[in-house]
Each structure stands twice: as C-alpha cells, then as structure tokens.
Amino acid sequence: MQFGADTEFSNMCGVTLMNTPIGRVVADVMGAKDGVELTEYPSMIRVDGVNRLDFDYDELTDALGQDFDGSIFEEISSTHYGRMVHLDDKTILFASPEDAAEFIGFDLTAS
C-alpha cells in the first residue's frame, strides 16, 4: 500500500495491531484471507483489506486456543481506517460508509 494524497475511493480498510503474541496470531489468521495484506513493523502489524475485514471471534478463539472477544480486539488494536462495526461475535471494518450503514440498517438519506 502506498501513502499519498489520492482523493479517489480506495475500497480499502484496515487496522493496526500490536505486535504481541495475540496480535501476531490475529494477524496471521487475517493474512491468510483473500484480499488481505499484512505489513510488519517492529512494534505493530498493519492489516489492510479490500472492501471489508471480518474479525470473527470464534475463528480467532480457535486459532489462539483461548477466548477472544471485543475487549481483546480493542486491547491489541490502535488506529483503523474505514467504518468499524462491533457485534457480539465479530468486529467488521468496511471500506465504504454506505456498506456499513446498510449493514446496520442506518438510512443515510436526508429526510
């Protein structure tokens, strides 16, 4: 991914995870998915995805061998871009605000 001042819609979303044992496993699970790119730094791991990223807590619990939920996601993540939706069983990042609004049933049209 290149940084710059391009004003066109990128159709990308992403999050920065702490490079800890838990963050590493989460990054590895996400990096195995189609359309997901990992960029590693000494203290953090960027997870960038095309259109949408789904952090499924059951999938991550299985990979970690211990419970994973929204509080742990919040603990290991810092910055993000895209629209974030937290559910009981997953966190979803959407590249498009319209897609996120449709997913949660929010009407973006002015009345």
Curated annotation (Swiss-Prot):
Induction: By propane and acetone.
Superkingdom of the source species: Bacteria
Xref: Pfam families: MmoB_DmpM
UniProt GO MF annotations: monooxygenase activity
InterPro entries: MOase_MmoB_DmpM, mOase_MmoB_DmpM_sf
Function as written in the Swiss-Prot or TrEMBL entry: Effector component of the propane 2-monooxygenase multicomponent enzyme system which is involved in the degradation of propane via the O2-dependent hydroxylation of propane.
Protein name: Propane 2-monooxygenase, effector component
Organism: Gordonia sp. (strain TY-5)
